Amino acid sequence: MCTGICFTDNVGNLYFGRNLDWNAPFGERILIMPKGYPLAYSFLDDAPSAHAAIGMGIAYKGYPLFFDCGNDAGLAVAGLNFPGYDQYERAPVNGKANVAAYEFPEWIAANFACISEVQTALENVAIVGKPVSEQLGTSLLHWIISDAKRSIVVEYMADGMHVYDNPVDTLANQPTFSFHLENLRNYISADGAFPEPAKWRRAELAPSGSGATLRGIPGDFYSPSRFGKAAFLKAHYPAKDTESENVARMFH
């Protein structure tokens, strides 16, 4: 199960995070990719990293396989599980910049400084389902990418690449991002405000406790439920001033 969100503080600093819940460890650890680090791509020309990046993932024969990361320009990316919907290219596509799925996060972090640059580059990109090795296989993912101004979601399916503006700065797992956005309409009656007492004929009805502000917001671990809850909390959580308070906000 994966859920990711991002937000900025009162002075424009980006906070970007996700959970990564597996039933077994992969040996993941903190990875640091220095600026100028040589990257040997599967289909693109080898090139040094234009940006330094730090994130979580595994290293395979000196190659950083980021699950999520952020670079020195303030651009961040995370891959979240998306089985049953994603469909990468089986082979490189002529006339396209072909990026192997396992390379996608580090390719983003190594080469771009903002969402606008990423969107321009993605207009000519094909994502190829080539695994880094036969032992590791290919992860079935979609991605949230963010800078301090906005975020996007990238999904690669049978009909090609989809790049969505992400107005709620949230992502979970399958189904598609467009489904998750549409599903939020089920919760529009929850506005984060404490309800006033109601009168039904002679009965005076007051809310039962402070949790009434979340009435109707799902609390289970199903992907659409996690997306709905995370998007709601992200939108209604009070703004904070300090770094420690905003880190706590991310974990909450």
Task: Place the predicted regions along the sequence by residue.
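A contiguous strand-loop segment
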Residues: 1-96, 129
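C-terminus-biased signal that marks the final domain/tail of proteins
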Residues: 1-15, 130-131, 138-139, 148, ...
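Short acidic-glycine loop/turn motifs at beta-strand connectors
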Residues: 8-11, 71-73, 146-150, 155-160, ...
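N-terminal short leaders/motifs
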Residues: 13-26, 94-108, 225-236
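A short, surface-exposed interaction/processing loop segment used at functional sites
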Residues: 23-43, 161-191
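Peripheral peptide segments
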Residues: 69, 82-83, 90-92, 121, ...
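Aromatic- and glycine-enriched pocket-lining scaffold segments that form the walls
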Residues: 115, 119-156
